[in-house]
């Protein structure tokens, strides 16, 4: 078993995310770990200018620096994405949600 099994829920990684033939490296929040997959939410710093419906899906990370992020960021809860755990083998853990943000995030999801 590789180091990717050391991944824990609420860890933040940078990984390549693709869509419609394009993509880029983005921060993601590990949420649910399976045997061979990890379900992640994308993290974004883009909030202003989004519709009210989109903003309602964004969870504000209060302790963004502890999460390894360089600016105020939000978890996009609109889509939970399943990725192969093996895809994280060479990825660097940049941080993790604070205890406060973990609790707030779980409350946010339960609404």
Where are these regions (language model features)?
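Short beta-strand or tight-loop elements
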Residues: 11, 26, 73
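Short, surface-exposed secondary-structure edge patches
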Residues: 1-6, 66
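Compact nucleic-acid interaction/catalytic patches
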Residues: 15, 21-25, 30-64
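A generic structural signal for short, non-catalytic loop/turn and secondary-structure boundary residues
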Residues: 8, 33, 52-54, 68-75
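Membrane-targeting and insertion segments and their boundary/processing signals
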Residues: 2, 48, 54, 75-79
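C-terminal terminal-subdomain/extension
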Residues: 61-111
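Short coil-to-beta transition motif at edge beta-strands of beta-rich domains
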Residues: 5-17
């Amino acid at each position: 078993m590789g180091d990717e099994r050391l991944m824990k829920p609420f860890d933040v990684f940078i990984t390549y995310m693709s869509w419609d033939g394009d993509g880029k490296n983005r921060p993601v929040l590990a949420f649910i770990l399976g045997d061979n997959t990890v379900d992640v939410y994308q993290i974004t710093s883009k909030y202003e200018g989004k519709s009210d419906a989109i903003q309602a899906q964004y969870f504000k990370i209060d302790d963004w620096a502890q999460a390894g992020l360089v600016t105020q960021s939000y978890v996009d809860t609109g889509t939970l994405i399943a990725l192969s755990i093996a895809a994280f083998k060479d990825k660097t853990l940049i941080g993790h949600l604070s205890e406060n943000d973990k609790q707030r995030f779980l409350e946010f999801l339960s609404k």
